[in-house]
Amino acid sequence: MKRKAARKPGRCGARAAAARAKSPAEAPAVLVKGDKRADLAGPGVSTYEEVEKILPADYAPILDRKETQIAIRIAKDAVEDGLCRELNLIRVECPLIVTKASGVNDYLDRDGSRTPIDFSCGLGLERRIEAQVVQAATKWKRMALAQFGMEPGEGLYTDMRAVRKDYFLDHDHSSYVDQWDWERAMVASDRNLGFLRDVVARLWKVVKGAEREAQKRFPRLRNPRYPDLPEELEFFHAEEILEMYPDLPRKQRETRILQEHPAIFIIGIGWTLKDGYPHEMRAADYDDWVTPTTSKSGGPMHGLNGDILVWNPVTKRRHELSSMGIRVNKHTLRQQLEITGQLDFLKFPYHQAILNDELPLSVGGGIGQSRVYQALLKKAALGECSVTVWPERLHEICAARNIHLLR
């Protein structure tokens, strides 16, 4: 697809991008390879023929199934201890279900293509409770900061479980989600890229610490065929990556840059870039992707959020570990909802609480548990680390390549 003429990103551009990123029911039946619309909002490979092509043919797991479970426990403890130490967090309980009326569920992106599971509960009630299974605890966590009386510099993490029914199920995308969802209170003066980078660096230190702990118990995880994660990750703005690879869609840009820089944090996900598309769709009511910032070279940028991605030497593919960011304040919440045409969200209690300064300013994110285990334990598929439902075809494709998904 030819690159469109660069233009200054803005509200009109963001609205246009949102309109182009239609829900699956509205989208064209066929998207040409290289079309930047194809992966705006959607994780997953999208066809099992493609999955067959990309999975390694020479895979041999380093740890067997029993050893893998032991290593998962070691890595899990190391990450949770590290989060508490590096970010001053405490563990709190997290809901699996929330009320629909609260507006606290996570819709993941802004095109409406990933809807939560709705159901009624409360046998014997005159009016049953309209509830939803959480897709992530993103918005709930910010409310929890107030509930638990967190001061700036204090925060919480949760052992979050969720269901995302609208994902394509492949080797690294599942309908069952296990995350360390975390949130930390902050002050207004921390709403800048320097603070964001410091938090990301602390998170990376936690991940590397977990890698070392797993390797203490299982030294053979230090395998030259599958290099360890780098000691430090590098920061790039989505706009900078677009300038480096202007003709590639988002996932291919990520794949290219990760081959040279195997651990990166991509800043500014959600704002419309110079080619007229956001790097990826991002919901308008938690991460701040609208705030103006400046690149290392002095160029105008936007966004106080991003993703941690690494190169997976087993699958030879991009591998996302975390999505996070400084959260919207009352001004940027309204700006972003106006851009996405969702000002009606302001009626919900969560959004009203932000507008009325009833919730702390915060930074937070989600770290995929099975995704971290997959990276640290040099696995080819999420299903080697977590138990969920997979189509039989995926079981067969994986088994033919010595990848055995748990049942």
What is each PLM-predicted segment?
Residues 31-407:
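Structured aminoacyl-transfer and RNA-binding surfaces used for tRNA recognition/handling
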Residues 5-10:
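Low-complexity, polybasic segments enriched for Lys interleaved with small residues
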Residues 1, 12, 16, 21, ...:
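Hydrophobic/aromatic hotspots within intrinsically disordered, low-complexity regions
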